[in-house]
């Protein structure tokens, strides 16, 4: 029996974004292409051609172009994807040929079979290039973080370095773009432009973790009419870096009236008299949940957010199909790959000629000098 191909949750999300961004303005059910796209991560070289041919065949069978105006709209969307095609000459040959077919309606109608074949090839070219680039970067990231050939101290250090590197990526790059604020440059003012991309990413990783950008984003969402009352996800994810000083501040508003309310003596609690049993149970449940997360008892990694419908990537507000599904998603993946490489170089062990000593610690070993 053939071994089951490894799957990547990250790539499942990324590939769906890529497919939907490329097929925007095209009347086609993208589910089959999305299912094929997911197979390109950890895909043996012998199977890639079959998967890509499956994508082309789906396009060939389902894509219809009614008029030249529709074709022009599709081409306007596809133009920006040229940056992620390894052979730009191929891209522009197909793209410019399709442009020529929009010269007159009669010419368009006469050449429609050729137009469809050309468009299907262009779409397949873009999808296969972007998906393979994304798969390579996701594979690198996951293999770097999941590598078993590490000491526990190195693994812990790398996971924490990567966690806060991603937090800075969100705070200094993604959130400012979403709310329309200028992106902060990682380099110091007065310095010459950084030619080494790795050095630029390194400086991004070294920027302060505590910023006001999350609060600024909440203000932005509030002005747009988005409910921001449930922000537990940002605390759990470690993005909203704040110390909670008073529990009452983060409980439902009714708890804040405790100081001005009469205490229910027979219930031996500090709840005001106008709170019913259902509200008391809800407050108790919230406290229990918070305690489990704060003490590490609940470590399932599940995170929900008021910024999403908690269903699919397409329900993001206000990101939706505007940012995550643009071609820039590959730029974010590339930044993450460079981050992972920088973290690896920073934490790789060097041979210092010492002696490895086994100790009764979860970290198991330490290095000592030869004496």
Curated annotation (Swiss-Prot):
InterPro entries: Poxvirus_G7. Keywords: Host cytoplasm, Phosphoprotein, Virion. This is Assembly protein G7. It is found in: Host cytoplasm; Virion. The keyword Phosphoprotein applies. It comes from the Viruses. Late protein which is a part of a large complex required for early virion morphogenesis. This complex participates in the formation of virosomes and the incorporation of virosomal contents into nascent immature virions.
